[in-house]
């Protein structure tokens, strides 16, 4: 089992670099940095991380091919690979409609866009002259002026078609899920995609990009996770909620509370233990270890400790290192 950790560059880059260095010291394998227009730039942040760490792999978790042209993404991640001494990984997904609506960007044909973008980025990274007349991605003899070496590409994927595509074309897949029930479905879709193109499914790094909250006090861990879990519930397809026995009405109540900024209700009772169980890896080190082992048994090969990580971020990173990574 590999271990990653996610940081959101709402914090200054040097603060994230401190946490990344601490994560490296605690045995984490990957640091993933989110990419949203309203936070600090992902590649600027990754540059700071590259200069302040030595061995941990660093990557975007995840960028997309709507706000950034694939040629620009290829140049950016190739630069990170060069600065970091070959430690860069690229996380690329379809993005999210709410962000694109806010930016005035049309979200068209995400499956075709993602597939074509990955092919173009691979060709750019390999030093090829790229000429494509794809359904969504088009180039006419574009080429980077430098070679990057091999950079693994991970796909952010949720739905069955995206998961199947990840099995076909990606080195890894970043799945926003925390529960074995969701990975039973996801692993099968990835396997289907891999076998379609003659790949060994074990070549794909199946990553649980999870809401994670750890503390020796389980109540503190749960309280830290509630707001993040609320947003997950509000954005989950009804089919996923049904899988976990959560009603559409409960989803609506949580969505309404978020829209009103009523976080007191979320902390009070709207976010139930059932939701915490379904949509997070949460609790004491022993609780988290049990869930990780359950996920490993299904086929998960990397755990990413995503927001909030814990009520005290520094303490949580050290707890994961000492009580989970060291023992696995």
UniProtKB/Swiss-Prot annotation:
Signal peptide: none
The enzyme's E.C. designation: 1.5.98.2
GO terms under cellular component: cytoplasm
Pathway(s) served: One-carbon metabolism; methanogenesis from CO(2); methyl-coenzyme M from 5,10-methylene-5,6,7,8-tetrahydromethanopterin: step 1/2
Any single biological process term in GO: methanogenesis, from carbon dioxide
InterPro entries: F420-G6PD/mer, Luciferase-like_dom, Luciferase-like_sf, MeH4methanopterin_reductase
Subcellular location: Cytoplasm
Keyword set, alphabetical order: Cytoplasm, Methanogenesis, One-carbon metabolism, Oxidoreductase
One of the Pfam families matching this protein, by short name: Bac_luciferase
GO molecular function, one term: oxidoreductase activity, acting on paired donors, with incorporation or reduction of molecular oxygen
Job description of the protein: Catalyzes the reversible reduction of methylene-H(4)MPT to methyl-H(4)MPT.
Family: Belongs to the mer family.
Protein name (database record): 5,10-methylenetetrahydromethanopterin reductase
Lineage start: Archaea, Methanobacteriati, Methanobacteriota, Stenosarchaea group, Methanomicrobia
Gene that specifies this protein: mer
């Amino acid at each position: 089992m590999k271990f990653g950790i996610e940081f959101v560059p709402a914090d200054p880059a040097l603060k994230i670099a401190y946490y990344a260095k601490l994560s490296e010291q605690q045995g984490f394998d990957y640091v993933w940095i989110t990419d949203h227009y309203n936070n600090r730039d992902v590649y600027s942040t990754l540059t700071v991380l590259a200069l302040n760490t030595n061995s941990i792999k660093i990557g975007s978790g995840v960028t997309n091919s709507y706000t950034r042209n694939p040629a620009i993404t290829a140049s950016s991640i190739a630069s990170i690979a060069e600065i970091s001494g070959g430690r860069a990984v690229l996380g690329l997904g379809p993005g999210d409609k709410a962000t694109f609506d806010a930016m005035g960007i049309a979200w068209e044909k995400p499956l075709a866009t993602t597939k074509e973008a990955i092919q173009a980025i691979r060709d750019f990274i390999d030093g090829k002259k790229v000429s494509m007349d794809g359904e969504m991605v088009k180039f006419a003899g574009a080429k980077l002026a430098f070679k990057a070496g091999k950079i693994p590409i991970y796909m952010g994927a949720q739905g069955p078609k995206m998961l199947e595509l990840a099995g076909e074309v990606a080195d890894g897949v970043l799945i926003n899920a925390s529960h074995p029930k969701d990975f039973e479905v996801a692993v099968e879709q990835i396997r289907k995609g891999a076998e379609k193109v003659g790949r060994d499914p074990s070549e794909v790094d199946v990553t649980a990009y999870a809401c994670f909250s750890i503390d020796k006090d389980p109540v503190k861990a749960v309280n830290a996770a509630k707001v993040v879990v609320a947003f997950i519930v509000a954005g989950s397809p009804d089919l996923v909620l049904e899988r976990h026995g959560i009603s559409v009405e409960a989803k609506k109540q949580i969505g309404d509370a978020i829209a009103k900024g009523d976080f007191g209700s979320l902390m009070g009772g709207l976010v139930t233990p059932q939701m915490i169980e379904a949509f997070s890896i949460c609790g004491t080190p022993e609780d988290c270890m049990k869930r990780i082992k359950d996920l490993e048994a299904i086929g998960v090969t990397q755990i990413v400790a995503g927001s909030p990580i814990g009520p005290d971020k520094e303490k949580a990173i050290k707890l994961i290192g000492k009580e989970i990574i060291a023992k696995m």
